[in-house]
Amino acid sequence: MKVIDGTIASPLGFSADGLHAGFKKRKMDFGWIVSEKPASVAGVYTTNKVIAAPLIVTKTSVKKAGKMRAIVVNSGVANSCTGTQGLEDAYTMQEWTAEKLGVEPDMIGVASTGIIGELLPMDTLKNGLSKLVVNGNANDFAKAILTTDTATKTIAVTETFGRDVVTMAGVAKGSGMIHPNMATMLGFITCDANISSDTLQLALSQNVEKTFNQITVDGDTSTNDMVLVMSNGCALNDEILPDTPEFDKFSKMLNFVMQELAKKIAKDGEGANKLIQVDVVNAPNALDARMMAKSVVGSSLVKTAIFGEDPNWGRILAAVGYAGVDVPVDNVDIMLGGLPVMLASSPVTFDDEEMKDIMHGDEVTITVDLHSGQEKGTAWGCDLSYDYVKINALYHT
């Protein structure tokens, strides 16, 4: 597998565009991804009981059609908690896009992110849609889906399947309300592989637990979380089938793309200065390891300690203990950046200058060794700074 300098439109047969329609005052806020032919599609959605209107529309269409031609996205207005009118507007958003592309409405996915409780300004939407073009600027799409993010989040890779080269690309947004059980988190992945929707869903479902579901910024789960994968077969490879070496290769490719996007989201948490990676190793099973890793990275006390560059192993051990995992914790090792701060559940002395260098970096890795098995789990998050409170205190409803 090779990482390339690409965009969400790098896979064959895809294009994208983004622009400023007026959902926000100045920044880009509207865009789409278009496949030249019907693409296989798979999705995962928020576990929040309050589900935004666009998710209802998209989830229903994915289930009904099993194929997708385009995804249209606005930022600035979430169209969540907007009742019957909000749902009607989401369907209208889908229908207008379908009319412009000359396809059936169920072939269109819709997504929104932004302020909860506001209806979509439909004149703004219609005007923006009239200006979107096929084969537009894919980099602008990555900008158009952002809200409080400080940077775009993209990744593109290639892999060979027999004599054919398959390209996969991803784009995401997310900075606050990131605690998916799957944040607001939106993720879109395009691919030109020949793979059915059912097989694509299998690959997505297998990998989401190890990637997007393992990030947390603030413990809040958004009403609008969605990850969609489209694969249109334009690479002309032999169909990828379950339980084959080709499926395993495709799954690893998808896992890499999703993991890179997840890490970019965690690193760009609201007000964040540092990316935190927690590796729980030598656990009895992978699920327990992932739960424990997420408990540590989600601890507000751990996050504030990392912000303050304090190697506070006590807070880490406390988060290990309340993770809800039935694992002995009387022989735990804890390392910060590879430097031991606890061995066999007892503190150890360490070199202060070496630790200062580790804690001062913009990425801090915490390793928790349970000595009770052979499985591993990883989670990602960020530190908790003064700016997080400031950003969310000023964000209006």
Curated annotation (Swiss-Prot):
- An example Gene Ontology molecular-function term: L-glutamate N-acetyltransferase activity
UniProt cross-references to Pfam families, sorted A to Z: ArgJ
Principal subcellular localization:
cytoplasm
Keywords of the record: Acyltransferase, Amino-acid biosynthesis, Arginine biosynthesis, Autocatalytic cleavage, Cytoplasm, Multifunctional enzyme, Transferase
- E.C. number, please? 2.3.1.35, 2.3.1.1
Upper classification of the source organism reads: Bacteria, Bacillati, Bacillota, Bacilli, Lactobacillales
User: Could you tell me which pathway this protein works in?
Assistant: Amino-acid biosynthesis; L-arginine biosynthesis; L-ornithine and N-acetyl-L-glutamate from L-glutamate and N(2)-acetyl-L-ornithine (cyclic): step 1/1; Amino-acid biosynthesis; L-arginine biosynthesis; N(2)-acetyl-L-ornithine from L-glutamate: step 1/4
Active site annotated at which positions?
184
Q: Where is this site: Involved in the stabilization of negative charge on the oxyanion by the formation of the oxyanion hole?
A: 113-114
Q: Which SUPFAM superfamilies match?
A: DmpA/ArgJ-like
List this protein's GO terms for biological process: L-arginine biosynthetic process; ornithine biosynthetic process
Q: What is this protein called?
A: Arginine biosynthesis bifunctional protein ArgJ
Please give the GO cellular component terms listed in this UniProt entry.
Answer: cytoplasm
What is catalyzed by this enzyme? N(2)-acetyl-L-ornithine + L-glutamate = N-acetyl-L-glutamate + L-ornithine; L-glutamate + acetyl-CoA = N-acetyl-L-glutamate + CoA + H(+)
Instruction: Write down the top EC class of this protein.
Output: transferase
